[in-house]
A protein has these predicted regions:
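N-terminal amphipathic/basic leader segments beginning at the initiator methionine
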Residues: 2-37
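Buried hydrophobic packing segments
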Residues: 22, 26, 48, 92-93, ...
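Hydrophobic face of alpha-helices
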Residues: 23, 121-124, 195
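Glycine-rich phosphate/pyrophosphate-binding loop regions near the starts of catalytic domains
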Residues: 28-188
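Short, glycine-/Ser/Thr-/acidic-enriched flexible segments
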Residues: 53-54, 67-68, 162-164, 188-190, ...
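Short, acidic (Asp/Glu-rich) active-site segment that either coordinates a divalent metal cofactor
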Residues: 156, 169-220
Length: 346
């Protein structure tokens, strides 16, 4: 098929042929994500997916969309783009599974100042890896070149995930009661939130990214670019055996904003601070930036990427399932008590 070209459009800053090259380079990455529901490959006007709702009485679709935020600035600074797509997928699918839904498919959106095919392919390679981890098909996406609106080296990345759950299995806060137990799934680090503060604390962009700290087992930049953990597989394994009462993805706003989102009125999550397994990077941020403890717990995940609330009698079984399915570090974080809706850290 003859490809279209526009020298005039290229002179204005949009290179159509670079777009074609990007698509060709990313095809092998997208192919890794294909699942039984995929109907066609990429390149059409819409992504097609055949829905299999077998065994569900009332199938409900669940959607989630998010981006990576200013963590992208570090990826751009270091010209390392192959893992940032994992973050994008994680931010979306981890939200979807909080409802008890199995992610089905994913789409990405990249806006850039200049389409450099190799860079775009590297970004999409990360998105594809995230989709593989989430057992979700990458069925489409968009790369938009924005000359004059964005600097040539800049880009933004966002994603969109769709999952499915039987209506009777939807997880919400309605059944949470005092006496329930809250479990913690450890994070891999800062994940994808709080990076505006992180960049300020460490003077990222002014050489701070290259510093080494004895409490970190790798250079600072590598610690900060560690991808957000994807919790899909362990949570789906848990859902086969136990119906959790609530799940919270600990993102922007930390404990104080995200945990209450999965609590009903009259219930408070009581957590002993010494029981939180805080990762070294957070102690380092607090020390280097003189950040108050309250602000730390109100900004970062502090080493807890996801919380799962279960009935007390299900706690041991839930931990065993998580330990056997990729979350050996899962632990009891706290309990639900009667009180004002919120979080009590003591």
């Amino acid at each position: 098929m003859m490809k279209s070209e526009s020298e005039s459009y290229k002179a204005a800053g949009v290179d159509i042929t670079a777009g074609y090259a990007s698509v060709e380079l990313m095809k092998k990455h997208v192919a890794r994500t294909m699942t039984a529901g995929c109907v066609e490959g990429i390149g059409g006007f819409g992504g097609l997916f055949a829905l299999d709702a077998a065994g569900m009485e009332e199938p409900v679709l669940v959607s989630g969309t998010d981006g990576v935020g200013t963590k992208l600035k570090i990826a751009m600074l270091l010209d390392k783009h192959d893992t940032i797509g994992i973050d994008c997928v994680a931010m979306c699918v981890n939200d979807v599974i909080c409802c008890g839904a199995k992610p089905l498919f994913f789409l990405d959106y990249i806006a850039c100042g200049k389409n450099v095919p190799e860079k775009i392919a590297s970004i999409v390679a990360g998105v594809a890896e995230g989709c593989v981890q989430a057992e979700s098909a990458l069925i489409g996406g968009e790369t938009a070149e924005h000359p004059g609106m964005m600097p040539e080296d800049d880009y933004d990345l966002a994603g969109f995930s769709v999952g499915i759950v039987d209506k009777k299995r939807i997880i919400n806060s309605e059944t949470v009661r005092p006496g329930d137990v809250m479990l913690a799934l450890p994070s891999t680090g800062v994940h994808s939130n709080g990076f505006s503060l992180v960049r300020k604390v460490f003077a990222i962009g002014n050489g701070g990214e290259n510093r080494n700290y004895p409490e970190l087992d790798k250079p600072l930049w590598e610690t900060l670019l560690t991808p957000t953990k994807i919790y899909v597989k362990p949570v789906l394994a848990l859902l086969k055996e136990i119906q959790p009462k609530a799940i919270s993805h600990i993102t922007g706003g930390g404990f104080y904003e995200n945990i209450p989102r999965s609590l009903p009125e009259g219930c408070c999550a009581k957590i002993k601070k010494s029981d939180v397994r805080v990762l070294p990077i957070f102690d380092l941020i607090a020390r280097e930036g003189s950040v108050p403890e309250r602000d730390m717990f109100n900004t970062f995940n502090m080493g807890v990427g996801m919380t799962i609330t279960v009935a007390r009698e299900d706690a041991d079984k839930a931990l065993a399932i998580l330990h056997q399915n990729g979350e050996p570090g899962a632990y009891v974080l706290g309990e639900i008590v009667a009180g004002e809706k919120g979080v009590e850290l003591w």
